[in-house]
Structures are given as structure tokens and as C-alpha cells.
């Protein structure tokens, strides 16, 4: 997707109500002649790809980035507390449920994302136009090459089967990625069946939940468990890790994308939206358009092993190539937020 064409098409034009916000920030906005152009970014992402994207954006547009980084929940609370005086222009967070939470709090302005389809699938765009995905990640399985046969692994639902008793590693249930996976099960199976599935997972745990996704993969490699739930890119990062122990752990397991013959693998996102009180809405629009350019999408794929949201983007990453393509769940990711409270 060409960045210049995105801007020319007005693909991310903010609705008039958002654009008419009074500019109360000194030197803010592109309308003040001679003032430096800036965009204030509140981001829950902490990846090196983003630093490279910001640098490329500034080089091409002259717009300087003022970056605030914190957890998604902290950013939401900060913007909410600041109210109409918030300096945030763009809010970026990981996990569709957090985007939903920010939307429910009234932190996003509505935007017209229609020009991005069909290059970006409808299920990756908020139906009400408050946010759009900028990168994808799949929540998948990593199983032992020695203790699990490939035909043993099929679906998420199968993990609740008693034959997996004492064999599963997973991080704690309050983790956003696990909550969204369970929310997807609620959306697909209904609350009662999803609750039974979650109880089955707990019954089959090899150990109490601990650590992050990399810890789960290491647990499989060490023999603490036979199969783990993880985001796909952690495994790919371990393959190229500077630590020999992480590389060895990755070699001892196989990454598996479940539900390939049914609903498709569960996909979550990083997403961005323009803040409702953005003092620089046009600069915010340009930054989000740049995130969706081929250049930025390629950086996500090559630097953090994330999956581009724009169809047809080419990248050079053999590790990501090895797990692509796969069948993904096509349910709108906004439903992960809709069912998060139940999960």
C-alpha cells in the first residue's frame, strides 16, 4: 500500500467533529505557519521495529515524534485522566480488548478507514471506525518434538481432553493474550462451553502458571510440559536469539497453528486510533497511514516477526516464511473486546 496514495485518497480523514477540535497546544497543528510539525504518540508497544518506523516517518514527512510508552492499561488511564487537555494524538496498544476498552472510554475519534479495504480485511477494522489494526500476531501451540506426535495436535478445543493431563504449560489467566483467546472461544462456542474448555485447560496444566510466552516454550524444551500456548513471534525470536539456550529450546519444539480445518487460528492485533482530543489530527492521520504503508508493514515482518495486516506486502524473513501462510479466524477482532469481560 503506497503511503502517498493513502494520503491523497484521504483514507484516514478524521470526521469533521474531530478535526474541528480547538488547538490549545502551543505550536500545535500544521495550520500554524512556521510552527514545527509534531505528533504525540502514546504507545504500549516496545519493539525495535517501531523506532525504525518512527525514524523513517520523520525523515519522509519532517513530522517529529513525541513518544510516551507505557502499558496499555496505564496509557488508557492517563488519557482518560487528562480529559480534553490530553496531548495524545495517536493511541497505539496491543490486544483488541484494550482497544475496545479505550473506545468504550471515549478516547478515540471516529475515522474513515473504508479506503483500506480490500487491502486490509474488514475483520481487522473496528466496525464503528475508532481504530484499525497495524500488525497481527497468532496465538498458537508449541509442542515437544520428542514427546508429542504431529497428529496428536489439532485444535484449541482438544487441549481440554484428559489425555493432555499434566502436559500443558501456559502463562497466568489474567494475561491479555490468554483473555482474548478465551474471549474468542466465548464468541465461537458460547459462554458455557468456553467455561468448560477453560476448566479443562486448568485440569491439564503441568505446573502453576508462571512467566511469559518464552518461559512456556522453555518449559516444553526442558521437559516440564509437552505443549504450550504462545504467540507465534516469540518462537521466531527465540530461533534468532543471541542466547544459545533460547535457540536450543526453539529447536526442541515445533510451532503449530490450531484449527486449520475449522475456525482458523486465533489472531490478535496491535492497533491504532486518533485520540478524540488530538491537538494534531492531521499529523496523526499521516502517521497511521504510514503504519499501513508497505515500508512499515515490511518492518513489522522483518524486525519483530509480526504478520502484516496489508495484503500483498513482501518481506525478507525466512523464519516468518516458514510458518506462513496459515488459516486465520476471520471473526472481527472487535468481538474479543465484546466478550472480554466474560472471559
Predicted regions and their residues:
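Short beta-strand->loop
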Residues: 42-45, 108-117, 127-128, 131-132, 143-145, 151, 157, 244-266, ...
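A structural signal for short loop-to-beta-strand junctions that line the ligand-binding cleft
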Residues: 86-91, 109-141, 157, 167-170
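Periplasmic solute-binding protein
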Residues: 96-107, 126-154, 182-183, 267-273
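Mature extracytoplasmic/periplasmic domains
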Residues: 270-331
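Ligand-binding pocket segment of bilobal, Venus flytrap-like solute-binding proteins
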Residues: 173, 177, 184, 188-258
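C-terminal motif of bacterial Sec signal peptides marking the signal peptidase cleavage site
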Residues: 15-18
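Early extracytoplasmic/lumenal segment of secretory-pathway proteins
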Residues: 20-23, 27-101
Amino acid at each position: 500500500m503506497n503511503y502517498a496514495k493513502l494520503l491523497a485518497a484521504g483514507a484516514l480523514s478524521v470526521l469533521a467533529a474531530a478535526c474541528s477540535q480547538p488547538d490549545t497546544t502551543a505550536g500545535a497543528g500544521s495550520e500554524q505557519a512556521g510552527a514545527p510539525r509534531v505528533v504525540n504518540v502514546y504507545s504500549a508497544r516496545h519493539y525495535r521495529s517501531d523506532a525504525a518506523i518512527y525514524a523513517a516517518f520523520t525523515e519522509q514527512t519532517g513530522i517529529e515524534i513525541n513518544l510516551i510508552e507505557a502499558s496499555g492499561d496505564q496509557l488508557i488511564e492517563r488519557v482518560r485522566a487528562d480529559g480534553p487537555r490530553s496531548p495524545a494524538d495517536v493511541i497505539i496498544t496491543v490486544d483488541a480488548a484494550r482497544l475496545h476498552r479505550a473506545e468504550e472510554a471515549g478516547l478515540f475519534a471516529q475515522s474513515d478507514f473504508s479506503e483500506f479495504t480490500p487491502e486490509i480485511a474488514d475483520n481487522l477494522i473496528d466496525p464503528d471506525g475508532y481504530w484499525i489494526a497495524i500488525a497481527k500476531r497468532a496465538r498458537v501451540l508449541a509442542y515437544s518434538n520428542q514427546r508429542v506426535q504431529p497428529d496428536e495436535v489439532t485444535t484449541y478445543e482438544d487441549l481440554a481432553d484428559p489425555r493432555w493431563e499434566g502436559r500443558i504449560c501456559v502463562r497466568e489467566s489474567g494475561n491479555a493474550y490468554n483473555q482474548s483467546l478465551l474471549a474468542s472461544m466465548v464468541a465461537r462456542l458460547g459462554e458455557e462451553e468456553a467455561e468448560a474448555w477453560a476448566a479443562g485447560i486448568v485440569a491439564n496444566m503441568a505446573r502453576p502458571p508462571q512467566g511469559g510466552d518464552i518461559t512456556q516454550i522453555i518449559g516444553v524444551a526442558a521437559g516440564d510440559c509437552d505443549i504450550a500456548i504462545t504467540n507465534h513471534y516469540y518462537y521466531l525470536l527465540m530461533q534468532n536469539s543471541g542466547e544459545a539456550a533460547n535457540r536450543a529450546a526453539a529447536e526442541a519444539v515445533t510451532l503449530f497453528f490450531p484449527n486449520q480445518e475449522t475456525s482458523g487460528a486465533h489472531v490478535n492485533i496491535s492497533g491504532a486510533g486518533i485520540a478524540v482530543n488530538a491537538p494534531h489530527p492531521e499529523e496523526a492521520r499521516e502517521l497511521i497511514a504510514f503504519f499501513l504503508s508497505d515500508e512499515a508493514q515490511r518492518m513489522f515482518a522483518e524486525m519483530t516477526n509480526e504478520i502484516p495486516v496489508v495484503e500483498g506486502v513482501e518481506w525478507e524473513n525466512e523464519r516468518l516464511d516458514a510458518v506462513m501462510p496459515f488459516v486465520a479466524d476471520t471473526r472481527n477482532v472487535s468481538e474479543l473486546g465484546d466478550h472480554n469481560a466474560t472471559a
